[in-house]
């Protein structure tokens, strides 16, 4: 959430910055509400003061033996008027709060202009796509040939956009999780944590999924307003909700593996084949909490940590900075890492790394105590995929496929596969 003060002091400037996203701020309505709020607030303060004055007069009149009935009537009338004014003020403030809750974060100055993913800007490339001397199969056919991927059975069990993995392919999937967690905790300084896969509405509000993106979530049929997590970002980031930590504890870095659940409500007809877009998938998430002046540098290191995984796996990829129209609701700046998929002859997203500034922290009241001033200040939050497990498996199935239908196992994963170097059809 943006600082509400900005809507009172810098409304035109905020509207101009949000336009970079293609977001139109209703400046006229906000100004109307703010003007009304000021008037009604003054009215409430005046009525409160008048009521207090009249209440004191009652005591004096009573002590002097005077008739206090007229004064009592005046106080009752003032109470009624004050109650009515307070209700009006509450309604105005509630509408303002609702509008502000639906306003996305302001973008960093360096975020490029653009409407959608076609306007994202490539920053760098790593690795050279492999040249095949045989006809390349996609991951669905490679996995089927290894008897390790079964979408038909998953469809019978649940429905579309689910997968069953078996045998060596399932072990390879597990190996990726272990490899990523070991790398991030052993080399990058993250603490591994385990969190609930079900969260409440407050948590989803804190990280920005609610109220605007409820249709993307799986809500449980329960009177407690529980949801399946769309990403570990939600429970991990909310660990700091309503907390004030000491400055000396910063930076805080968490690595967490969870399944993720998404309705893909806006993705009808897209990536219907295979594992690219699933309702349930695994991810290793990286979350950081830092001091405000350090978040942009932290974003660069966070992206580097995700890149390390791709480099160790020798998977060609590129890094792009998202344009204004493609940057997520809560983010001020986002990099995507896109891995090379030979069957599609293109790069596909495998990690998204974002700096949220104090946007999430303000919603969550996540703060640290400034060692110099002794006062609490808002943290800056960041997160990124390190990496999406399913899409990494897809990339390995395609980039490491062999002419005879077997699959070479990346060297860094072999220790997690009991030294196995390849997978062949059983």
From Swiss-Prot:
What Gene3D superfamilies is this protein classified in? Bira Bifunctional Protein, Domain 2, Serine-tRNA synthetase, tRNA binding domain
Q: Name one Pfam family in it.
A: tRNA-synt_2b
Q: What does this protein do?
A: Catalyzes the attachment of serine to tRNA(Ser). Is also able to aminoacylate tRNA(Sec) with serine, to form the misacylated tRNA L-seryl-tRNA(Sec), which will be further converted into selenocysteinyl-tRNA(Sec).
For this entry, list what GO says about its biological process: selenocysteine biosynthetic process; seryl-tRNA aminoacylation
Which GO CC terms are listed, alphabetically?
A: cytoplasm
**Catalytic reactions of this protein:** tRNA(Ser) + L-serine + ATP = L-seryl-tRNA(Ser) + AMP + diphosphate + H(+); tRNA(Sec) + L-serine + ATP = L-seryl-tRNA(Sec) + AMP + diphosphate + H(+)
Q: Does the keyword Ion transport apply?
A: no
Q: In which residues is L-serine bound?
A: 231-233, 285, 385
**First-level EC class:** ligase
- Could you tell me the keywords of this UniProt record? Aminoacyl-tRNA synthetase, ATP-binding, Cytoplasm, Ligase, Nucleotide-binding, Protein biosynthesis
InterPro entries to which the protein is assigned, alphabetical: aa-tRNA-synt_IIb, aa-tRNA-synth_II, aa-tRNA-synth_II/BPL/LPL, Ser-tRNA-ligase_type_1, Ser-tRNA-synth_1_N, SerRS_1_N_sf, SerRS_core, tRNA-bd_arm
Protein name, entry field: Serine--tRNA ligase
Question: What free text does the record give on domains?
Answer: Consists of two distinct domains, a catalytic core and a N-terminal extension that is involved in tRNA binding.
**Gene encoding this chain?**
serS
Ligand binding (ATP)? 262-264, 349-352
Instruction: Quote the subcellular location field of this record.
Output: Cytoplasm
Name the major location.
Answer: cytoplasm
Top-level taxon in the UniProt lineage = Bacteria
Spell out the molecular function terms from Gene Ontology. ATP binding; serine-tRNA ligase activity
Pathway it works in: Aminoacyl-tRNA biosynthesis; selenocysteinyl-tRNA(Sec) biosynthesis; L-seryl-tRNA(Sec) from L-serine and tRNA(Sec): step 1/1
- Subunit structure, interactors included: Homodimer. The tRNA molecule binds across the dimer.
Q: Which family does it belong to?
A: Belongs to the class-II aminoacyl-tRNA synthetase family. Type-1 seryl-tRNA synthetase subfamily.
Q: Does the keyword Iron apply?
A: no
Q: What is its EC number?
A: 6.1.1.11
